[in-house]
Amino acid sequence: MQTNTTVVVASGRALLIDPAWLPDELGALAAELREREITVAEGFATHAHHDHVLWHPGFGDVPRWASSRTAELARTERDDLVAALGPDFTPDLIDLMGRVDAGTPAFDVELIVHDGHAPGHTAVWLPEPRVLVAGDMLSDVELPLPFWPHDVAAYERALDLLEPYADAARIVIPGHGNVGTDARARLDADRRYLADVRRTGRSDDPRRANAGMDAEYELLREILAATTDLS
């Protein structure tokens, strides 16, 4: 799994967004921040999936924020989130996972809350550098994934909400995939993919060739076929 962690630094203090993913990577990130004399001041989780609500003791006991729906799901779905972690996570990492509260970071950010990909999913806009931290959307390697409750319309509304930020962004950071300068092109590709499958039941999106994506493509076809006449 290719994952991205975003570290927003101001005057030696950091907002840590979606620290991930493996225990040794979390430990290495904590060590790197110490070496650079950067103190974690706050954390933020973009959504309540197990690889986005992680933490490490080396980051410190600081406020960890999320949207209200994400914070709620992190509590109510905790058993499933823990089960998804796997055997390499130690008890201290398991205990820290998902301990987020509803709130907004003190850093200069704008939160863009929607229900695409997951209920309460949140993108983070950094206005001065014009960076869009997109969570699990706008990926160059993953197809659009309208996960539980498989609400494709909510995903399409989320793309509409993200559009002005994608237009303004100099940099886009997806949860999985490569950092890029092509936020609007990625948004257009996601819209085209969903529209093609909705209209014809097919898509030739090149991301289908990436690991796990063809299965997600087939799932989307099933979801849309249940509500759309694809003949």
What is the meaning of each model-derived region?
Residues L26-G27, A31-T104, A195-D196:
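Active-site HxH/HxHxD metal-binding segment of metal-dependent hydrolases
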Residues P164-I171, N178-S231:
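Accessory terminal helices/loops
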Residues M1-R36, V40, D92-P164:
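Catalytic core of the metallo-beta-lactamase
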Residues L22-D24, A48-L54, A71-A74, P119-H121, ...:
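Active-site environment of divalent metal-dependent phosphoester hydrolases
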Residues T6, I17, D79-F89, A185-Y193:
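Conserved N-terminal glycine/acidic-rich loop preference
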Residues I17-A20, A41-D51, W65-S68, V113-G116, ...:
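Active-site neighborhood of phospho(di)ester-bond hydrolases with catalytic His/Asp-centered motifs
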